Amino acid sequence: YPSRTKDIDDVDFSTGSVGLGVAITSFASIVQDYIKSKSWGRDQQLGRMIALVGDAELDEGNIYEALQEGWKNDLRNCWWIIDYNRQSLDGVVREGLFQRLEKIFDAFSWDVVRVKYGVLQCAAFD
């Protein structure tokens, strides 16, 4: 996992595998939007909250609470990148789960962009 003390890039939250880092990005976005709405925060430049998530991590319930909070607060500066590698400490993630997950994200009005294959993934971040 990323470390604020060991990595040279900006890493705001170092967390474990229980979905906390994913949820933190949503709530940090809400806080950032609140600060921006105040007179003392209007000059602040908005950042992006990005979480790298394993598909097995989507078993955690707090992630779905964060999805709903994102919908209720119309978040636009929060990105979740889900690595659908079907690996888990407990076993293998079921095939076909990603289609169900996409429907859940759609239901909460999150934009879903599916990127497959290394070349396309690299192009998404150029």
Task: Locate each region found by the language model.
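Acidic-glycine-rich active-site phosphate/pyrophosphate-binding loop
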Residues: 1-7
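Glycine-rich ThDP/TPP pyrophosphate-binding loop and its adjacent helix/strand module
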Residues: 7, 11-126
